């Protein structure tokens, strides 16, 4: 047996080690980062160029993502002063979901976004950013509004202790989110949107794409929190809705969810609505003829200003009456918090991916309508629902 000199062995070992180092560095530099593609639908990775997508600028990443990614984006209405609170929302949503998909983001404002705002959010998001301006006519009091009557009504709401009773900007926001956001050119080009607001939190790591779920299951609208509206803010909303239905009886979907929003077959509104600070929906539902007519009818009443109609009851009534109930979805898996209320999943498999406490969830509060949703949609209650609801 031939024995190699000790010096030769050392040289050979050094060559092997150097080869391994070069190979590892080559893989790290040129093989795609697998986490980017987790949960995505990819037919053939050979069509992808072999480099780390994370090294690209955010605006350049979309062309390297799977071509079966849904045509969707996050949509946020925000002010420049919301920057810090919004960055918290963005970072948490990127961490729990979007770092794997790099969906883009549409930011809308009734004023021009500052350079500081743009620079920070572009740095924070993993997809492309688009910034849009709300047209002035969509953020101003219409000429047909009697402003003396409006201010008199605001005083009455103040006496009742209603939140935002005399806030004009809040009413502009509710009116815009009810009937104009989906008409913005930056939003219209997408099939689905996910609404995100400043100061919200996302508790659970998602191992699936909610946009893809919506598309594959033909869902039109999805929510995480459903609660009861303050009746003092919308006294004429249901009467106006009933008048609209009388004028347009064919507007009602034959498989509607009237039994979710009314306890007496439509005579009155029970106040149940989906909290729209989180919603994932199809853009074309709002673009439909029936919803456009409905919003225009409500808008002409002036009660976005005379009263304090919110976009949440407006959206929820419309979805419950004009959409197929089978196309409405509850994303139980998405743990979510908005100042004042939150949703925390109950099932053990999902909770293992979350950092929230079910005891702090609003779902078992008397204000919640989730129990009504389960009943109206004939869905089974979670296994340990009774434990937390007492």
UniProtKB/Swiss-Prot annotation:
GO annotation, biological process: cell wall mannoprotein biosynthetic process; protein N-linked glycosylation; protein O-linked glycosylation; protein O-linked mannosylation
Keywords: Endoplasmic reticulum, Glycosyltransferase, Golgi apparatus, Transferase
InterPro entries: Glyco_trans_15, Nucleotide-diphossugar_trans
Pfam families tied to this protein: Glyco_transf_15
Active-site positions on this chain: 279
Subcellular location: Endoplasmic reticulum; Golgi apparatus
GO molecular function, one term: alpha-1,2-mannosyltransferase activity
Sequence intervals crossing the membrane: none
A GO-annotated cellular component: endoplasmic reticulum
EC number: 2.4.1.-
Superkingdom classification of source: Eukaryota
Physiological role: Mannosyltransferase involved in O-glycosylation of cell wall and secreted proteins. Plays a major role in extending alpha-1,2-linked mannose in the O-glycan pathway.
Family: Belongs to the glycosyltransferase 15 family.
Protein name: O-glycoside alpha-1,2-mannosyltransferase omh1
Taxon lineage: Eukaryota, Fungi, Dikarya, Ascomycota, Taphrinomycotina
């Amino acid at each position: 047996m031939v024995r190699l000199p000790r010096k030769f062995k050392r040289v050979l070992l050094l060559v092997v080690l150097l080869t391994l180092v070069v190979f590892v560095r080559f893989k790290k530099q040129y093989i795609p980062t697998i986490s980017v593609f987790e949960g995505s639908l990819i037919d053939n990775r050979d069509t992808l160029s072999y480099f780390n997508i994370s090294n690209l600028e955010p605006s350049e990443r979309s062309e390297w993502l799977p071509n079966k990614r849904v045509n969707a984006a996050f949509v946020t209405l925000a002010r420049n002063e919301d920057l810090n609170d919004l960055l918290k929302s963005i970072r948490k949503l990127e961490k729990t979901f979007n770092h794997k998909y790099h969906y883009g983001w549409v930011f809308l404002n009734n004023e021009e976004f500052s350079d500081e705002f743009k620079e920070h959010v572009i740095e924070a998001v993993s997809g492309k950013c688009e910034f849009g301006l709300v047209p002035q006519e969509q953020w101003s009091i219409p000429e047909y509004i009697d402003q003396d009557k409006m201010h008199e009504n605001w005083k009455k709401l103040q006496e009742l202790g209603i939140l935002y009773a005399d806030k004009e900007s809040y009413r502009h926001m509710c009116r815009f989110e009810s009937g104009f956001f989906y008409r913005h050119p930056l939003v219209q080009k997408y099939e689905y949107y996910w609404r995100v607001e400043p100061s919200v939190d996302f508790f659970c790591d998602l191992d699936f794409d909610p946009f893809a779920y919506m598309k594959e299951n033909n869902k039109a609208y999805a929510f995480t929190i459903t609660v009861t509206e303050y009746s003092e803010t919308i006294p004429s909303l249901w009467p106006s809705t009933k008048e609209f239905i009388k004028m347009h009886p064919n507007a009602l979907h034959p498989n509607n969810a009237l039994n979710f929003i009314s306890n007496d077959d439509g005579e009155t509104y029970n106040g149940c609505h989906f909290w729209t600070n989180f919603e994932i929906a199809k853009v074309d539902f709002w673009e439909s003829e029936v919803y456009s007519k409905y919003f225009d009818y409500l808008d002409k009443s002036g009660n976005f200003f005379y009263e304090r109609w919110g976009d949440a009851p407006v959206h929820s009534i419309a979805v419950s009456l004009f959409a197929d109930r089978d196309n409405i979805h509850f994303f139980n898996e998405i743990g979510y918090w908005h100042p004042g209320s939150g949703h925390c999943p109950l099932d053990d498999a999902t909770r293992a991916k979350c950092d929230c406490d079910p005891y702090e969830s609003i779902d078992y509060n008397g204000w919640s309508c989730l129990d009504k949703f389960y009943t109206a949609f004939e869905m089974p209650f979670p296994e340990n629902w009774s434990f937390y609801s007492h």
